[in-house]
Amino acid sequence: MLQDNLIKFFEESFKEHSDAPAITDYFTSEVFTYYTLAQEVAKLHMLFDACGLKEDDKVAVVGRNNPRWAAVCIATLTYGSTVVPIMQDFDANDINHIIAHSHARLLFLSDIFWDIVEPDSARRVKAAFSLSDFRCLYERDGEKLTAFQRDILRHFNARYPKGFLPADISYEAPALKHVAAICYTSGTTGFSKGVMLTVGNLTANVSYTLSRKLFGRGVRTLGMLPLGHIYGFVLDMLAPLAAGSHITLLGHIPSAKVLTKALQGVHPHVVCTVPRILEQLTRKEVLERMQTGAVR
């Protein structure tokens, strides 16, 4: 019988590794420590309260991989709602379909994606926020949430007058049968298909990964897969964060040149990828060597 709970993994990891780097944006060099990440999660929980978010409500996320993308995901999971990660390379029709089909209540997007959201697909959406700085891009009723986000630091300091402490990192563990995420695949016919994953599903996968000792404090990982992809979602984000590892996010699937430079700069201990990316990298290296006569 499964006794562990993914949410408690995060609580323990964030407390234990509060001074360690959690996520780095490769292209902007922005770094979230585990303490910073926990702070952002706490601020998002306050925003969710202001939005009236409920347990069964869905929070959709689409955009370039960055530390705030991960913060929204972790905040949604630890709040007890359901996250809907959307692949950033899906076309506009698929993205609008997923927003509507999932009944998303809140949207977090890279700014360029807000321009493609259609009114009909966002009928149930209460508000949308930018993944660059969490400012409010849209709210259905008035400007309450816009004002709330504008003054979020004041609200945060009022909530934690003695400062945000590791002891304040505390998350209620939802039932293992609770739907934690709905991941949409590209499918072979028609629109994207949604796969519901429970807390128990994700806990089992993360627990197994942790048992293999792939991740831990001081372990560097290079995240190149879209976090909206279930493989990247679990192995480039959930499992490393549950173990105290340091994730460097490339933002999108890289070219062979960018990937080679990133590998040389980050020196990752663990890289999770798919055969297509490895093929691109090795093909480029082998072809260059053949053209220069290094390989005969």
Question: Where are the model-predicted features located?
Answer:
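Conserved AMP-binding/adenylation subdomain of ANL enzymes
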Residues: 203-220, 227-296
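Structural core segment of the AMP-binding/adenylate-forming
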Residues: 51, 78-157
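Conserved pre-ATP/AMP-binding loop-to-beta segment of ANL
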Residues: 19, 149-184, 191, 214-220
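Conserved AMP-binding A3 loop
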Residues: 31-35, 172, 180-206
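ATP-dependent adenylate-forming carboxylate-activation enzymes
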Residues: 63-64, 84-99, 111-114, 247-266
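A short helix-loop-beta submotif of the ANL/AMP-binding
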Residues: 58, 64-84, 88-92, 100-106, ...
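A short N-terminal helical cap/helix-turn-helix that marks the beginning
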Residues: 1-22, 39
